[in-house]
């Protein structure tokens, strides 16, 4: 297939994003308008506020993406957009905008699964990466360990049965008074603490899955904090978050390594916002090196929600002839591998 230039749009949560991507791996622009400062005062994302801010920002974000890329609508071969999972109101803003563009410009519309987008972020930073490989997807809303069999073809080996890892980070951060967003704040404070100070539980299911559970360790942290407060004992917040982080990171690492062994894979790619966590990166690199497993991370800008990853995933769908109808609707509970 000749060079394909895709304009991608992402609005699944609290970032309004647009990007221009060539052949799935070359990013000409990647513009993100974040609402994090707005939602911080609420202690988390407020869906209605997020939707309104997307409406206000989306036109300017798309125009900037085209300008930075040095292209016009005439140069675009397809319009890609996230249609799930995510906040339904937020998804609809991006989806309706993309539909309008695709219809008015007579361009193909490609709906992209947000989680698949996170996985595809690795194709941008690692130009020679090709399936098969193992991918650990860790974000505020999702935690999966996946065997990527081919472009757009996934086998879910393990997933969370309750809280996502990033969600647990946010809840623990709130409990110790760090506020939102929890992940980066815990990562920073944990560097000052002793990760062996408190033994928090790690969930290990005695079945044939490599599923995750983070509600137990989250509850253990909350119980520890309550007990310390009842005793009027001083709480070392750095030790608490370092010990919590260690429990989460070790489970994520263990299951990713086990998946490599099960599927005889020699590469692990990391995806999602928690992929920026320094302890997770260090632990995976260390354990991977011991076993001859190459560990790959996207750059921090590609770990967060962005449209470049959506443009990358869309390209590989376009190669297979998978384009969407104008009747495409938002699917807030869309699962990995579903259409």
UniProtKB/Swiss-Prot annotation:
Quote the record's binding site residues for Fe cation.
Answer: 114, 118, 305
Entry EC no(s): 2.3.1.234
Swiss-Prot/TrEMBL keywords: Acyltransferase, Cytoplasm, Iron, Metal-binding, Transferase, tRNA processing
Listed under GO cellular component are:
cytoplasm
Q: Where does substrate bind?
A: 137-141, 170, 183, 187, 277
* Pfam families assigned: TsaD (PF00814)
Alphabetically, the GO molecular function entries are:
iron ion binding; N(6)-L-threonylcarbamoyladenine synthase activity
| GO annotation (BP), single | tRNA threonylcarbamoyladenosine modification
Q: Where in the cell is it found?
A: Cytoplasm
What this protein catalyses is:
L-threonylcarbamoyladenylate + adenosine(37) in tRNA = N(6)-L-threonylcarbamoyladenosine(37) in tRNA + AMP + H(+)
Q: Give the cofactor note text.
A: Binds 1 Fe(2+) ion per subunit.
Where primarily located? cytoplasm
Required co-factors: Fe(2+)
State the HAMAP family in the record. Answer: TsaD
Function text? Required for the formation of a threonylcarbamoyl group on adenosine at position 37 (t(6)A37) in tRNAs that read codons beginning with adenine. Is involved in the transfer of the threonylcarbamoyl moiety of threonylcarbamoyl-AMP (TC-AMP) to the N6 group of A37, together with TsaE and TsaB. TsaD likely plays a direct catalytic role in this reaction.
Assigned protein family: Belongs to the KAE1 / TsaD family.
Q: What is this protein called?
A: tRNA N6-adenosine threonylcarbamoyltransferase
Taxonomic source organism: Clostridium perfringens (strain 13 / Type A)
Q: Which gene encodes it?
A: tsaD
């Amino acid at each position: 297939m000749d060079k394909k230039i895709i304009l991608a749009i992402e609005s699944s949560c609290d970032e309004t994003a647009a990007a221009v991507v060539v052949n799935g791996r070359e990013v000409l622009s990647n513009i993100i308008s974040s609402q994090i400062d707005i939602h911080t005062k609420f202690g988390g994302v407020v869906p209605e506020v997020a939707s309104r801010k997307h409406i206000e920002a989306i036109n300017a974000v798309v125009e900037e993406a085209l300008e930075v890329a040095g292209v016009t609508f005439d140069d675009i071969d397809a319009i890609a957009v996230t249609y799930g999972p995510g906040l339904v109101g937020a998804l609809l803003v991006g989806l309706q905008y993309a539909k309008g563009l695709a219809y008015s410009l007579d361009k193909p519309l490609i709906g992209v699964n947000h989680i698949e987008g996170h996985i595809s972020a690795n194709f941008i930073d690692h130009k020679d990466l090709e399936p098969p490989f193992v991918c650990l997807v860790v974000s505020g809303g999702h935690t999966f360990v996946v065997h990527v069999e081919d472009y757009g073809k996934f086998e879910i080996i393990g997933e969370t049965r309750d809280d996502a890892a990033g969600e647990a980070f946010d809840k623990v951060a709130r409990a110790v008074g760090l506020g939102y967003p929890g992940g980066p704040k815990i990562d920073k404070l944990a560097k000052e603490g002793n990760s062996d100070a408190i033994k928090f539980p790690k969930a290990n299911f005695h079945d044939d899955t490599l599923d995750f559970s983070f509600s137990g360790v989250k509850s253990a942290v909350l119980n520890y904090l309550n007990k310390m407060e009842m005793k009027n004992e001083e709480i070392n917040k750095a030790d608490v978050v370092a010990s919590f982080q260690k429990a989460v990171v070790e489970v994520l690492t263990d299951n990713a390594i086990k998946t490599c062994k099960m599927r005889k894979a020699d590469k692990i790619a990391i995806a999602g916002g928690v992929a920026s966590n320094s302890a997770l990166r260090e632990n995976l690199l260390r354990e991977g090196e011991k076993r001859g497993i190459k560990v790959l991370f996207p750059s921090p800008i590609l770990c967060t929600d962005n449209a470049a990853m959506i443009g990358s995933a869309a390209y590989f769908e376009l190669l297979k002839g998978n384009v969407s109808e104008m009747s495409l609707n938002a699917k807030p509970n869309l699962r990995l591998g579903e259409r």
